[in-house]
């Protein structure tokens, strides 16, 4: 089998991405762009994974392959890995044969490995994109056989082109940090982002840190905690006597672009998409990397901005109410505006367009 290149046939992109939103949402950004250019888009993923819910809602057909990770799983799962991998290879082979893609885009997740290997076997051009600063095992292997290798952080894979992470257009369209910060006065505005599952460490420490600050200089906080932790977070604020005039606890934020735009400082984890969004929005950040992330990749993600003067990095074991209160008290809006400008300098707002263009070029090669 070879990829179709005839002008008489509609061109087809096979997207491989699954497991987490950090893989799926960037892939959706690229898929929408190519669909708007007239391409057919088919998704290879696991119907029981997050992609099984998200991808069909965005109008793309999902071809399901049963395969998942083994890290942190029991001995039975690890023992069955060879059998499960063989099944995934066979199922992926069938998908690639049926779809006959002009180009295959791997955006991460365990499903990328069997799909990528079978694409190469059948002669379909493979474009690989690594979202994190430390590449996962599947991408490290596939990078050796891919036609094009792209990365969101410089140096994540040998010889990869740094294109950034595809992010939502509304973030890149925000006014410059200089314009936003210049008109502000009064207490700092702090956005705390815990993600859909919340971040227990932030939910515990931030309320106690704010309580240590004088009420007249205390930052105004919007604290997103996730539905499962919102009641605990509100109780934490109530326990230290902080009401909604100083801290608004919310389970979700519908308009993240607006939330980033109004903030002087974001306190958050350091997942790949979060770091990329902070840079695209042009906002100062205090990163508290999740300490149990695979290969501690969140710390390396955060260093991309902290080493360039665009963010602060605080390891979770070092995060305490007193130290956080001291940090918040010492920061000025002028310092944060400078950090925000440096963050915006590292953004790659054209990432989705660049990945889409590379897919088109690879299909025509």
UniProtKB/Swiss-Prot annotation:
Pathway terms, separated by semicolons: Cell wall biogenesis; peptidoglycan biosynthesis
Transmembrane stretches, start-end: none
Enzyme class, broadest EC rank: transferase
Residues reported in the UniProt entry to bind UDP-N-acetyl-alpha-D-glucosamine: 20-22, 132, 168, 196, 253, 298
Catalysed reactions listed for this entry: di-trans,octa-cis-undecaprenyl diphospho-N-acetyl-alpha-D-muramoyl-L-alanyl-D-glutamyl-meso-2,6-diaminopimeloyl-D-alanyl-D-alanine + UDP-N-acetyl-alpha-D-glucosamine = di-trans,octa-cis-undecaprenyl diphospho-[N-acetyl-alpha-D-glucosaminyl-(1->4)]-N-acetyl-alpha-D-muramoyl-L-alanyl-D-glutamyl-meso-2,6-diaminopimeloyl-D-alanyl-D-alanine + UDP + H(+)
Keyword ATP-binding found: no
Annotated compartments: Cell inner membrane
Membrane protein topology class: Peripheral membrane protein
InterPro entries: GlcNAc_MurG, Glyco_trans_28_C, GlycoTrans_28_N
Keyword vocabulary terms for this entry: Cell cycle, Cell division, Cell inner membrane, Cell membrane, Cell shape, Cell wall biogenesis/degradation, Glycosyltransferase, Membrane, Peptidoglycan synthesis, Transferase
Main location per the UniProt record: membrane
A GO MF term: undecaprenyldiphospho-muramoylpentapeptide beta-N-acetylglucosaminyltransferase activity
Cellular compartments per GO CC: plasma membrane
Entry's family note: Belongs to the glycosyltransferase 28 family. MurG subfamily.
Function as written in the Swiss-Prot or TrEMBL entry: Cell wall formation. Catalyzes the transfer of a GlcNAc subunit on undecaprenyl-pyrophosphoryl-MurNAc-pentapeptide (lipid intermediate I) to form undecaprenyl-pyrophosphoryl-MurNAc-(pentapeptide)GlcNAc (lipid intermediate II).
Protein name, per record: UDP-N-acetylglucosamine--N-acetylmuramyl-(pentapeptide) pyrophosphoryl-undecaprenol N-acetylglucosamine transferase
């Amino acid at each position: 089998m070879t990829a179709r290149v005839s002008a008489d046939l509609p061109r087809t992109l096979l997207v491989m991405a699954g497991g987490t939103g950090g893989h799926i949402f960037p892939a959706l950004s690229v898929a929408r762009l190519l669909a708007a250019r007239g391409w057919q888009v088919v998704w290879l993923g696991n119907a029981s994974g997050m992609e099984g819910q998200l991808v069909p809602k965005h109008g793309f057909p999902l071809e399901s392959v049963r395969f998942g990770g083994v890290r942190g799983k029991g001995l039975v799962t690890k023992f069955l890995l060879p059998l499960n991998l063989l099944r995934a290879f066979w199922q992926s082979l069938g998908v690639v044969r049926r779809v006959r893609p002009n180009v295959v885009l791997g955006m991460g997740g365990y499903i990328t490995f069997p799909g990528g290997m079978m694409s190469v076997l059948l002669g379909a051009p493979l474009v690989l994109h690594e979202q994190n600063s430390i590449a996962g095992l599947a991408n490290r292997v596939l990078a050796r056989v891919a036609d094009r290798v792209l990365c969101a952080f410089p140096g994540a894979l040998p010889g990869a082109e740094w294109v950034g992470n595809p992010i939502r257009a509304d973030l890149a369209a925000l006014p410059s940090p200089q314009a936003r910060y210049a008109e502000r006065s009064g207490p700092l505005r702090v956005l705390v982002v815990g993600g859909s599952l919340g971040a227990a460490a932030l939910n515990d420490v931030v309320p106690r840190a704010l309580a240590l600050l004088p009420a007249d200089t205390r930052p105004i906080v919007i604290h997103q905690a996730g539905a499962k932790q919102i009641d605990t977070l509100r109780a934490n604020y109530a326990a230290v006597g902080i009401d909604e005039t100083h801290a608004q606890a919310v389970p979700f934020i519908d308009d993240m672009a607006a939330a980033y735009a109004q903030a002087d400082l974001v306190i958050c984890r350091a997942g790949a998409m979060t770091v990329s969004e902070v840079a695209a929005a042009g906002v100062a950040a205090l990163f508290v990397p999740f300490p149990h992330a695979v290969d501690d990749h969140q710390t390396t993600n955060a260093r991309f901005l902290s080493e360039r003067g665009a963010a602060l990095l605080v390891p979770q074991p070092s995060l305490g109410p007193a130290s956080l209160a001291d940090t918040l008290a010492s920061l000025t809006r002028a310092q944060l505006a400078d950090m925000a400008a440096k963050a915006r300098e590292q953004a790659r707002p054209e990432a989705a367009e660049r990945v889409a263009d590379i897919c088109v070029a690879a299909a025509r090669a």
